[in-house]
Curated annotation (Swiss-Prot):
This is C-22 sterol desaturase ERG5B. Its cofactor is heme. One of its GO terms (molecular function) is oxidoreductase activity, acting on paired donors, with incorporation or reduction of molecular oxygen. Belongs to the cytochrome P450 family. The third module or late pathway involves the ergosterol synthesis itself through consecutive reactions that mainly occur in the endoplasmic reticulum (ER) membrane. It is found in: Endoplasmic reticulum membrane. The chain crosses the membrane at residues 43-61. The gene is ERG5B. Its main location: endoplasmic reticulum.
Length: 534
């Protein structure tokens, strides 16, 4: 009986196999017949149409109910607009809704203009990671500390916090004072060479900020030639920082991404060399004068402590900043992330600060008077950290400048998993989510008459209490490490300039038009004439 059942099962199986094979043969025959009847062009057009339909379907599915174009330009999306961004287009995008989207090539990008949604993104490290822009990991290296998450990021950042204490910052000021002396002389010389006719100062403002950063990071370990070359070449890095790049363009010679990568590699090598020189100098007993000096000093103190503990000593005093040892390459890489974060933002802030104060002599006169008073009437007195607390109006000017023309208008993140941004919208894994800072800083409900530059709102108004809207330095685990250092250096720069220089802004039809180049700049590049005060 069993054998009969087995035989029947075998026959049934054979019949089923034969039937399946026959069906497949018929299907293959149909496909073969179709392919034979179609030309190569027809096949290519069909495949292309299927890909377009898939690309369109994925865009519509990801878009869901949020604002954005109803359909996507096949494959590339608004790539041309991304290459040449217009500030008015950003304003329109932010105004279209609290969440809006675009899709460029393979990247789906959601912009968050709502303040509370921006805070949620900044404070959701389990759902998102900073990506800055897609090219950032290539330029900075994937191992850079800014891309670390969780405990690894927290511990690395804790070790860097000690570089921005009041005590540490005070050691950087003499080097910065020398930079101001040098470049203020250059500003005047440039105007004289141009026969006191207005000229664009945006390039020199980029250079002074690069010099400030490099001297603050490395002191005299870096040469002036290297500083000037980095200031000139770093433009290539900024140019590569488009929100979305052509895929694989970093491997195509002479593209923006290719040039940016070469520049980044050269800067990293220079910074690693400076780190090695610093270690040798500090090992010889030198006093710290720059950020890397302070960092290496903390490493040396930590090593001595660990050695004493390892030797069984019980009374060893634990350093305030107990950290591991870092290689020259790690130090160089970290300083490069600082330069990466500061160069364009600081250059933008400096450009607008000099332009706006030239347009507002009432503000400049009051700032000048305050800075002379805090120096006891002697304009030659160097800036000291203790002066900052005695400069309420200068601080208000800096804060209003950072609100009025924020140097960071948004911070791109990438979703590491499905992220329920709102109860009604979930962003898919791998998509970019971009919390925007500008709308919160120009909210008329929080800052009345937001398009007017008004430092007084920080003194007699209630702007100081609107902390949730103060997104200049971001929020959450990845907020700006230098949120105290940045206003300090700006106050030092403009305070010294107000006492030593006069400058006149020659307005053009493009002075108030905003160019988007990583951050915000005046379209005419700030037409000024500098002279020495009598």
């Amino acid at each position: 009986m069993a054998s009969l059942l087995d035989c029947g099962a075998g026959l049934a199986s054979a019949n089923a196999s034969f039937s399946t094979a026959t069906d497949l043969s018929q299907e293959n025959g149909l496909f073969s017949s179709w392919f034979e009847r179609c030309s190569k062009t027809q096949i290519a057009v069909t495949i292309f149409a299927v890909l377009i339909a898939y690309d369109q379907f994925m865009y519509i599915w990801r878009k869901g109910s949020i604002a954005g174009p109803a359909f996507k330009i096949p494959f590339m999306g608004p790539f041309i607009q991304a290459l040449y961004p217009k500030f008015d287009a950003y304003l329109a995008q932010w105004a279209s809704g609290p969440l809006s989207c675009v899709s460029v090539f393979h990247k789906f990008v959601v912009l968050a203009s709502d303040r509370d949604i921006a805070h949620k993104v900044f404070k959701s490290p389990t759902f998102v990671k900073p990506c800055i822009v897609p090219m950032a990991e290539t330029l900075l290296r994937p191992s850079a500390w800014v891309f670390l998450q969780g405990r690894a990021h927290t511990e690395y950042r804790r070790g860097l916090n000690g570089l921005f204490t009041n005590k540490a910052i005070s050691t950087y000021l003499p080097a910065q004072e020398k930079v101001y002396d040098d470049y203020f002389e250059r500003f005047v010389a440039a105007s004289e060479a141009n026969k006191s006719k207005p000229m664009a100062f945006m390039r020199l403002f980029r250079e002074i900020n690069c010099a400030l950063s490099c001297r603050t990071f490395f002191g005299d370990y870096i040469s002036q030639d290297a500083v000037e070359k980095i200031a000139e070449d770093f433009y290539q890095v900024t140019a590569a920082l488009e929100l979305v790049n052509v895929p694989l363009s970093v491997y195509i010679p002479f593209t923006k991404c290719w040039r940016g990568k070469r520049t980044a590699d050269a800067v990293l090598a220079e910074f690693a060399s400076c780190a090695a020189a610093c270690k040798a100098n500090m090992a010889a007993g030198a006093e710290p004068k720059c950020i890397v000096d302070q960092w290496v000093l903390h490493m040396m103190e930590s090593k001595r402590y660990n050695d004493r503990i390892a030797a069984g000593e019980t009374g060893a005093e634990k350093p305030k900043n107990l950290i591991r040892e870092f290689t020259d390459e790690e130090i160089g890489q970290t300083m490069f992330t600082f330069l990466f974060a500061s160069q364009d933002a600081s250059s933008s802030a400096t450009t607008w600060l000099f332009q706006i104060l030239a347009q507002r002599p009432d503000v400049l006169d009051r700032l000048r008077e305050e800075n002379l008073s805090v120096r006891g009437g002697n304009k030659e007195t160097p800036f000291e950290l203790s002066m900052l607390e005695s400069l309420p109006y200068t601080n208000a000017v800096i804060k209003e400048l950072l609100r009025y023309r924020p140097p960071v208008i948004f911070v791109p993140y990438e979703a590491t998993k499905k992220f329920p941004v709102t109860p009604n919208y979930t962003i898919s894994k791998g998509s970019m989510i971009v919390p925007s800072c500008y709308p919160a800083l120009h909210d008329p409900q929080v800052y009345p008459d937001p398009e007017t530059f008004d430092p007084e709102r920080w003194i007699t108004g209630d702007a100081e209490s609107k902390t949730k809207n103060w997104l200049v330095f971001g929020a959450g685990a990845h907020d700006c490490l230098a949120r105290k250092y940045v206003p300090l250096t700006m106050a030092a720069m403009i305070g010294k300039a107000s006492l030593e220089l006069d400058w006149v802004h020659h307005a053009t039809s493009q002075s108030e038009e905003i160019r988007v180049f990583a951050t915000l700049f005046p379209e005419d590049e700030c037409q000024l004439v500098f002279t020495r005060q009598g």
